[in-house]
Design a protein with these regions (language model features):
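Non-catalytic regulatory/accessory regions that flank a structured catalytic core
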Residues: 1-132, 187, 255, 261-268
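Cysteine-based protein phosphatase catalytic domain of the PTP/DSP
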Residues: 91-205, 220-267
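Conserved G/P- and acidic residue-centered "switch" motifs that form tight phosphate/ATP-binding loops
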Residues: 210
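Hydrolases whose catalytic domains are alpha/beta-hydrolase-1, hotdog thioesterase
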Residues: 213-221
Length: 268
């Protein structure tokens, strides 16, 4: 969730913990006094039955999510509206074993995260968003806390609704730690430059924490805008000096390299 490496393993762990809860309450249900039990649809229900069912459901949901993360499939199953950036109420009901821990982790991570400010050499809270080049910002899902009116927002999250005020909005939902494809990078970069030229002002590229997914897309944007010749320069010289917490995993680097070969090198 908060890192760009092995995110899917966190949902494997959640599934495992949920199974432990399911096993505990299932055994408790068998040992309980049946005098307070009641029948529902032909099944005997005790005080431990509902918790056991909830933990069992959480085991299945987080197991499925972990598989989808690993396969880089199913970004649409949460029902996020890619036009408005909203997530429907039913998603929170059906996928609550995913939404609840994701929401808690992200907010706790935001609260405790610190970084060494390169300008002051002092450890400070990680900003919800950082301007790394004039008019180009990178951040997490709490960018609305800056109370800015953005010219354009690129949203890489599949797990959070969009909460920023913006003139133009582009959603490319991806699982945490999973990069946009080379084609998606080209689309996002071209779109961002077009909005920047059209409206001026500030462009925000964000994921959940402003570290991996958003960094991948912003590298492409900065190259497309003509600020840097390669994504490597955009990352090392254009982004990381201002926001040191930004990272790129192996898949992100591979996709950026493929994007550069397909859409940048051929255009020269």
């Amino acid at each position: 969730m908060g890192t760009v490496h092995g995110v899917w393993l966190k949902y494997v762990a959640l599934s495992g913990l949920s199974f432990a809860g399911y096993s505990y309450f299932s055994e408790s249900s068998e040992d309980e006094d049946r005098s307070s039990a009641f029948s529902l649809l032909g099944l005997t229900v005790t005080r431990s039955t509902l918790p056991a069912l909830a933990w069992g459901y959480s085991t299945a949901v987080n197991g499925v999510i972990a598989i989808l993360f690993k396969l880089e499939w199913g970004m649409s199953i949460l029902g996020k509206d890619t036009v408005q950036g909203t997530i429907p109420w039913w998603s929170y009901v059906v996928w609550f074993p995913f939404h609840i821990p994701t929401y808690l982790y992200t907010n706790i991570h935001k609260f405790i995260s610190r970084y060494k400010n390169p300008e002051t050499d002092v450890y400070e809270p990680v900003p919800v968003a950082t301007q790394v080049q004039t008019g180009w910002w990178i951040g997490g899902c709490h960018g609305h806390e800056l109370h800015k009116d953005w010219s354009a927002v690129i949203d890489l999250t599949v797990e959070f609704p969009e909460s920023c005020r913006t003139v133009a909005y582009l959603a490319i939902p991806t699982w945490d730690g999973v990069p946009a494809s080379p084609a998606q990078l080209e689309h996002a970069a071209a779109w961002a430059v077009q909005q920047h030229d059209k409206y001026g002002g500030d462009i925000l590229v964000h994921c959940a924490h402003g570290r991996g997914r958003s960094t991948t897309v912003l590298c492409a944007c900065l190259v497309k805008a003509g600020l840097f010749e390669t994504w490597q320069q955009a990352f090392e010289e254009g982004i990381k000096p201002k926001r040191p917490v930004c990272k790129l995993n192996k898949r992100m680097r591979e996709n950026l390299t493929q994007w550069q070969e397909l859409y940048v090198a051929k255009g020269k």
